[in-house]
């Protein structure tokens, strides 16, 4: 009982002391005194001995009952464990989690002011702060925290930008009064600004807890104009109901206390897939803020948490189980190069003084100002460039230049900026006129007897560069060019005739390449009818995967310009015609075209020549069709070729997207007609013209000047995706491949003779969505003009001996090891080029049988010019089954090197002697000098290849070597390589494609 009396005396003493403090401060109130007396009386009643003596027996009974309930729970757990075989600890964990979920709740995650600032605070100030009114003045060094300040609502379907308040508006109005007559005491202690240490954004979402809506907010400091400095952090989270998403920002920023300070920080909100009703609120936001006042004589003292975590992280998102959350922040660090580039100027002087000019003559005059500049060897600042001529003359004698210490070095005369501008003139070529930027010019002859397939020009681009033109010497002696190359062609032919020309640029060609409209159109090309367009301008990016090129780049890489006739003269001219051409260095920056066969691009620039559509003059119905299996070989009934875009598309099984076509009129402008273009299947050819026009179609008409029309067919024109390659063994009606149909709508008529010819080119596929890895078809359908390839022109290869273990490998080649006379030589060897697939063997009387498998990956390696990244290879070795395991002595060794010469050392060596069957895996990393890309055996930079030299010991026991290849995730290609045509079966009786001997 004595302990209770002592505690009561202490409580009454503290209460009396607080009452005296209130009287001293003038805040004493009888109503407050009465309420506090009631509270103390209630506490005394609870702690009295009489009440405890009455409640003690009940407390004991409740504890016993609780213990009994625990025993019952344990019995139920044992029973459930016995009946359902559930471990007891699982049920215990569930019970504990349930009890914890009942007792705990999600709290604010913002750190307290004490965690951010360690500003000292006395006991008297803590007691005194309890009795300060809300309108008190914020002082320097005072730590403040505000919870649940309203921010605003995130409205669906609208651009949402909300201001993040730093403190409530009512307190801001008290700190910054509207009247200038407000009485302010102790001015030095009044806070002039606040340091915002932490801001927590809480989003109360109105959406369903099971929705998939996501969104985010960007925390912006609007006092900065540069986005690099303004955007402080960004967070992304799921906007679904239930637990409120929270994000912590640590601005670490001082904000001046004034009107409008709550408008400085803003949240820019966005939702990527919101299906909420427009105009309704997705969520409403509130903010928790922790800050510290800063005055003239007191600042803030950060804690270790603030220094080590808050300043380092800048932002932190609260992650909940089953919810995606992410946050990023940005820092714009200062770099010494900025001082070199922009400099720093200090101006002083220029004060106005009263100067005596003569007796009783005075005038106001401004003294000369001086400038001190801190800069390196960079360009002059914009401020110095805008100074007027008069001011510049005045400052000539008063300007002082201060260089940083590390830049004060003695420079040779040739390193001075003036000499550099005179000698290092690498950028002036592209800034001149067309006359001064012309580097080549000449004439090409088009014979009057030109027919389809006539090659007007096909040669190296370096051979066209002149020596006497104004821009040619400068171009030849410039190390780097970073802009496009522009071709200008002019010809004036009568409009009563017409001819179709194709101009193409390709990065490189093989020795026995084919020059026609199918091969030269794959990289950079344009279709031209001089009768419709007298002047043609054509720009290309010479380096498809790098930023620079030069004259030596043309000479040593084999860049090629080709011009061929794709449609003959509509009316034969009386003489040969000449095309005047000229080449200029353009001022447009280059664009790179890099492709990854494992990751489909959003836009695939196919640039595939679909063929010529020939319509006879008359009123009869005429229907033409072209298949859209763009991964197959392209050509006509005589030749077929593969190009880099075709090989890239063939890497996937199925495709769908928006197909963009270009229609070019190739005949005379006098021959006119209206065409309909639409998508349909092959079995729809039995429909009448009236039924065919019921398909969603596009009208194609040409004007007399341009002669071009563009047509697009989106995904809505296709029921589903279709195969990129179609087997020639499948009949046309069962291929399931959509066709581009072109139908004459009315009539084809003219006052002159001739057919109405239209060229069709597939430019690109937008929203390209392929799926599935395609190992390839041994029998691939060849696309023939106006029809699909028949079975008689199918492509055959040597029979496949084995298949890959998983469907991510492409077959490379197969070799049948010959039988040798072991008394003379006990080994056999062959070489395989891994980058440009070719096989070479030491015949010397041996019957080698080997073939390259026409898989999409092999075609991609052959037709792509530049390559970089990893390639994975697999060799399956199959021995002869009639050799006993105990008698097996055959070995296989693979030496991978950069070139076939003996002076090149091995990069990879693999050896095996396993009997009967084995598998060898290895990989190579292609890395070249052109932005990481490498060209096969190019003189430019002495670029090489990757060769695999295989030596077989005791080859009589060896049977078959089967090679496979697979691209790595970082493998990329660029540029088209014009290759030789594919060998069609039945012409030489070999039945192989192609065979290298």
UniProtKB/Swiss-Prot annotation:
InterPro entries for this protein: Como_LCP, RNA2_polyprotein, Viral_coat
Keywords associated with the record: Capsid protein, DNA-binding, GTP-binding, Host cell junction, Host-virus interaction, Inhibition of host innate immune response by virus, Nucleotide-binding, RNA-binding, Suppressor of RNA silencing, T=3 icosahedral capsid protein, Transport, Viral immunoevasion, Viral movement protein, Virion
Domain of life of the native organism: Viruses
Biological process terms in GO annotation: symbiont-mediated suppression of host innate immune response; transport of virus in host, cell to cell
Site (Cleavage): 413-414, 800-801
Residues the record marks as site: Interaction with the viral RNA: 430
Pfam assignment, any one: Como_LCP
Region (Involved in tubule formation by the movement protein): 370-376
GO function terms (MF aspect): DNA binding; GTP binding; RNA binding; structural molecule activity
GO cellular component: host cell plasmodesma; T=3 icosahedral viral capsid
Name used for this protein in its record: RNA2 polyprotein
Organism: Andean potato mottle virus
Record lineage: Viruses, Riboviria, Orthornavirae, Pisuviricota, Pisoniviricetes
